[in-house]
Amino acid sequence: MKSLSFLNHEFEAFPSPELALTDPNGLLAIGGDLRPDRLLTAYYHGIFPWFNAEDPILWWSPDPRAIFIPGQVNISTSLRKYLKKQPWRFTINHAFTDVMAGCAQPRRKQAGTWITHEIQMAYRELHHNGHAHSIEVWQGERLIGGLYGLAIGQVFCGESMFHRETNASKAAMAVLQQHLIKMNFKLIDAQVMNPHLESLGAKALKRADFIQLLTQFRDDAVNPAAWIPSEVFLEL
């Protein structure tokens, strides 16, 4: 039976994602906090927080789930040609806080953002502890795009991306894919399907199939050098 759970500030297990509501799609639990151990437990089980500043913390596990397979992100011929002409630089874990701030800026026709100060503080702590990571796109010394997310074993859980120049967020996605392939990651969790993700090649999986893949790869060892801050060259 579908049901909504209410969490308190004592650490407790999340309910099974199978119990998430169908309307709104994937809402599983309300409350709790954003402590690192709770967040990591959530992602480990295919659950993530998503809420507005005026709301309590809401925990989700939607069905279907948007995912990418590293190597199958769609980098079109026209995008490759465009990126080859740009004098951009790409880095990993050089400016996590700034990337989160860029992602938190309200989008066009949006009044606010779900990446609240509370969310930013929580994920900055995860970054400090080696769990959350960023990709940066630079034009000179100016940050023009990027993305961030969490690594759970050989699964990268993407959270958000932004751009200040055309195609800069797509460039960040191309860099992420290249890096994950080199580090033998198996899955990118993109959470909720939208037209932009679909245009990049995201696939919609039944939640049960996603959880099966997550369970398969979440405990796999990762190269210790995978997330050392570095500058990378985008191979097109």
Curated annotation (Swiss-Prot):
- Keyword Cytoplasm on entry: yes
One biological process term from GO is: protein catabolic process
Q: What GO molecular functions are on record for this protein?
A: leucyl-tRNA--protein transferase activity
Kindly state which reaction or reactions the protein catalyses.
N-terminal L-lysyl-[protein] + L-leucyl-tRNA(Leu) = N-terminal L-leucyl-L-lysyl-[protein] + tRNA(Leu) + H(+); N-terminal L-arginyl-[protein] + L-leucyl-tRNA(Leu) = N-terminal L-leucyl-L-arginyl-[protein] + tRNA(Leu) + H(+); L-phenylalanyl-tRNA(Phe) + an N-terminal L-alpha-aminoacyl-[protein] = an N-terminal L-phenylalanyl-L-alpha-aminoacyl-[protein] + tRNA(Phe)
Would you tell me the Gene Ontology cellular component terms? cytoplasm
Annotated compartments: Cytoplasm
* EC category name: transferase
Keyword Oxidoreductase listed? The answer is: no
Q: Which parts of the chain span the membrane according to its record?
A: none
Major location (coarse):
cytoplasm
Keywords tagged on the record: Acyltransferase, Cytoplasm, Transferase
A Pfam family that this protein carries is: Leu_Phe_trans
Q: What is its EC number?
A: 2.3.2.6
The record's InterPro entries line, in alphabetical order, gives: Acyl_CoA_acyltransferase, Leu/Phe-tRNA_Trfase, Leu/Phe-tRNA_Trfase_C, Leu/Phe-tRNA_Trfase_N
Give the top-rank taxon of the lineage listed in the UniProt record for this protein: Bacteria
Q: Which HAMAP family match?
A: Leu_Phe_trans
Spell out the family assignment given in the record's similarity comment: Belongs to the L/F-transferase family.
Q: Which PANTHER family match?
A: LEUCYL/PHENYLALANYL-TRNA--PROTEIN TRANSFERASE (PTHR30098), LEUCYL_PHENYLALANYL-TRNA--PROTEIN TRANSFERASE (PTHR30098:SF2)
Entry function: Functions in the N-end rule pathway of protein degradation where it conjugates Leu, Phe and, less efficiently, Met from aminoacyl-tRNAs to the N-termini of proteins containing an N-terminal arginine or lysine.
Q: What is this protein called?
A: Leucyl/phenylalanyl-tRNA--protein transferase
Q: State the gene name recorded for this protein.
A: aat
